[in-house]
Amino acid sequence: MKVLLANPRGFCAGVDRAIEIVERALKLHGAPVYVRHEVVHNKFVVDGLKAKGAIFVEDIADVPNEQVVIFSAHGVSMAVRKQTQDIDATIYDATCPLVTKVHKEVIRKQKQQHQVILIGHKGHPEVEGTLGQSNEELQLVETIEDVGRLNLSKNTPISYTTQTTLSIDDTKHIVDYLKSKFPTIDAPKKDNICYATQNRQDGVKILMQSSDILLVLGSSNSSNSNRLREIAEKMDIPAYLINDADEIDELWLKDVNTIGVTAGASAPEVLVQEVIHYLCDKGVTKVIEVNGAKENIHFPVPKELR
């Protein structure tokens, strides 16, 4: 058996930055620091930060006054931001800069009196944060059927934007339908699209040309990790989303010659290497790094933590 390793894989710049913010805040202030929602959607990462003194909460009401509070990489609504200010917290914002760009774009379009459509998954924390960026209503669509139910004024400009963990491929069918239904609709700027989401999906497509199965390192609540699994499944290749090597079922490897391995944007490389070690123990004799898009993007932490 052999393993094909996808490139790029694992941490993106936004995840790197978010984790670094929590670690630097702990070093500067000491434990505990409070993090609103999981800073990134990965159990291994979250458990590691908990061990260092981070406390993860879903509701700011669970945070005592005058504490350190960090917003997760997914972003928060204006209401959550105000609630945190009201308890005199020291705030560090780990929102991915690409998510922040979407927030600013939504606010800008609404100031221009546009009706704004958000393509995304209902209930995802990034979507909840984007929906809560202003008092004006955004209309959320998840499917083509949702587009048919939109209640829009014919005399007001229309714009759309997307959840950053959805690639161009993920949203193409909805975008195409929106453009056919509303020919003058404004599209987001190209640089609002998350480079990491698209690159990791493109990497999986390359792997799937030569792989019998795909193993995706990532947590079940990670949107981008689930999309990687779905790409393989749409190509009729068995794919499994796993937290770590312990979750691999040996039956998956029966009669398999080539195993594709990748990791979602919030999964650390150490987990990939543990999987490789496990597979080598099970008979893998060759591990090949497959070429993909090069990434050299870095997002700095807030100046207060430098």
Swiss-Prot record:
Has UniProt tagged this entry with the keyword Iron-sulfur? yes
Q: Cofactor(s) for this protein?
A: [4Fe-4S] cluster
Record keywords? 4Fe-4S, Iron, Iron-sulfur, Isoprene biosynthesis, Metal-binding, Oxidoreductase
The reaction(s) annotated as catalysed by this protein in its Swiss-Prot or TrEMBL entry are: isopentenyl diphosphate + 2 oxidized [2Fe-2S]-[ferredoxin] + H2O = (2E)-4-hydroxy-3-methylbut-2-enyl diphosphate + 2 reduced [2Fe-2S]-[ferredoxin] + 2 H(+); dimethylallyl diphosphate + 2 oxidized [2Fe-2S]-[ferredoxin] + H2O = (2E)-4-hydroxy-3-methylbut-2-enyl diphosphate + 2 reduced [2Fe-2S]-[ferredoxin] + 2 H(+)
Q: Which residues bind (2E)-4-hydroxy-3-methylbut-2-enyl diphosphate?
A: 41, 74, 124, 164, 222-224, 266
* Top EC class, one word: oxidoreductase
Where along the chain is dimethylallyl diphosphate bound?
Answer: 41, 74, 124, 222-224, 266
- The signal peptide here is none
Q: Which residues does the entry assign to the active site, renumbered to this chain? A: 126
Q: How is the cofactor bound?
A: Binds 1 [4Fe-4S] cluster per subunit.
Pathway it belongs to? Isoprenoid biosynthesis; dimethylallyl diphosphate biosynthesis; dimethylallyl diphosphate from (2E)-4-hydroxy-3-methylbutenyl diphosphate: step 1/1; Isoprenoid biosynthesis; isopentenyl diphosphate biosynthesis via DXP pathway; isopentenyl diphosphate from 1-deoxy-D-xylulose 5-phosphate: step 6/6
Any Pfam family from its record, for instance, is LYTB
**Superkingdom, taxonomy of origin:** Bacteria
This entry's Enzyme Commission designation comes to 1.17.7.4
Binding positions for [4Fe-4S] cluster per the UniProt entry: 12, 96, 194
Q: Which GO terms describe its molecular function?
A: 4 iron, 4 sulfur cluster binding; 4-hydroxy-3-methylbut-2-enyl diphosphate reductase activity; metal ion binding
Function, as annotated? Catalyzes the conversion of 1-hydroxy-2-methyl-2-(E)-butenyl 4-diphosphate (HMBPP) into a mixture of isopentenyl diphosphate (IPP) and dimethylallyl diphosphate (DMAPP). Acts in the terminal step of the DOXP/MEP pathway for isoprenoid precursor biosynthesis.
Q: Which family does it belong to?
A: Belongs to the IspH family.
The name on file for this protein is 4-hydroxy-3-methylbut-2-enyl diphosphate reductase
Q: Which organism is it from?
A: Ruthia magnifica subsp. Calyptogena magnifica
Query: From which lineage does this chain's organism come?
Result: Bacteria, Pseudomonadati, Pseudomonadota, Gammaproteobacteria, Candidatus Pseudothioglobaceae
